[in-house]
Regions:
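Short, hydrophobic secondary-structure boundary micro-motifs
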Residues: 32-34, 125-126
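Surface-exposed, charged secondary-structure patches
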Residues: 54-102
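Short, low-complexity N-terminal intrinsically disordered segments enriched in polar/charged residues
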Residues: 1-30, 38
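A short gly/proline-enriched turn/hairpin at secondary-structure junctions
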Residues: 34-51, 65
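Short beta-strand edge/turn micro-motifs at domain boundaries
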Residues: 1-2, 105-134
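Short, solvent-exposed loop/turn segments at secondary-structure boundaries
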Residues: 44, 102-104
């Protein structure tokens, strides 16, 4: 049986996105495992992952918990630039209810997670996700 590298890269991207989204819904520290060491923002601004991790902690600290998390992945795409480098994205829609004491708020919308292939592993280099802002 012949190996299909396209399928493997697509599956890796989807699996990484699912781990990120599920970690988001649980407000889990494991979310950092999917992040690159650097992030590329619009205007080619580059920031370290520690800035993103601090931002995620701040966002997660605004709610006691997230409940009812749901998502649909609509598109996955990537482009390889040699054997060890590439860029890709996973996009779709996501929603959840942010609960704080006796109040709750529904947060939903489109998402797009941007990835870079580094050392054989896809890592997130930019986040567009409901409830997240830089």
């Amino acid at each position: 049986m012949q190996e299909n590298p396209t399928f493997n890269h697509q599956a890796d991207l989807v699996n990484s996105a699912i781990r990120f989204i599920n970690s988001w819904f649980r407000q889990s520290k494991t979310i950092t495992a999917e992040l690159s060491n650097f992030f590329i923002l619009p205007g080619n601004k580059v920031i370290g992952a520690e800035v993103i991790v601090a931002r995620l902690k701040g966002i997660f600290g605004q709610s006691d918990e997230y409940v009812g998390g749901r998502y649909d992945i609509i598109d996955v795409n990537f482009e390889l630039m040699g054997e060890e480098k590439g860029m890709g994205f996973v996009e779709g829609v996501a929603g959840f209810r942010a609960v704080l004491k006796d109040q709750s708020k529904i947060i939903s919308g489109p998402f797009k997670l941007y990835f870079a292939l580094q050392n054989g592993s896809w890592k997130i280099v930019n986040i567009e996700f409901p409830g997240f802002a830089y």
